[in-house]
């Protein structure tokens, strides 16, 4: 029990340090599904999002791999060439966003007939990465109607 209390105390200390690192009014926190911890991880790993014009999803390792030969085109999942920590952060955020973010929830419902399980959650993570890029790049809070 002492070990559990020590770990809880350490967790609170780390969360406090994260709050000092990232301003509370950062626009990433306007996105439903991205909380304090994951938001801080994403901001720390990405830095300035303006350096990504088109390749943010690839930097996160969530870009699709498409193989083509002749007339056939086959999708082979995600590349996994990007930042593994970011990929994991967006995956975890997507698990929550499916429940609380109306855009991700709608995306999930539209695609669950075609995709299953982890592939569908990964697709939601990619969508969440695109939303995160747009919010940070254009410096506008999340708006589900856009």
What residue ranges belong to the model's regions?
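A detector of single, family-specific signature residues
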Residues: 1-146
């Amino acid at each position: 029990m002492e070990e559990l209390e020590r770990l809880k105390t350490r967790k609170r200390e780390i969360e406090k340090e994260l709050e000092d690192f990232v301003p509370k009014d950062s626009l990433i926190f306007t996105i439903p599904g991205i909380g304090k911890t994951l938001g801080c991880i994403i901001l720390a790993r990405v830095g300035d999002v303006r350096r990504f014009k088109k390749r943010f999803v690839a930097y996160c390792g969530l870009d699709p791999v498409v193989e083509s030969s002749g007339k056939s085109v086959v999708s082979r999942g995600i590349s996994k060439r990007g930042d593994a920590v970011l990929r994991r952060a967006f995956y975890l955020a997507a698990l929550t966003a499916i429940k609380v973010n109306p855009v991700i929830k709608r995306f999930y419902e539209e695609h669950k007939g075609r995709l299953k399980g982890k592939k569908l959650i990964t697709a939601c993570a990619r969508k969440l990465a695109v939303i995160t890029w747009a919010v940070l790049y254009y410096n506008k809070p999340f708006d589900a109607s856009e």
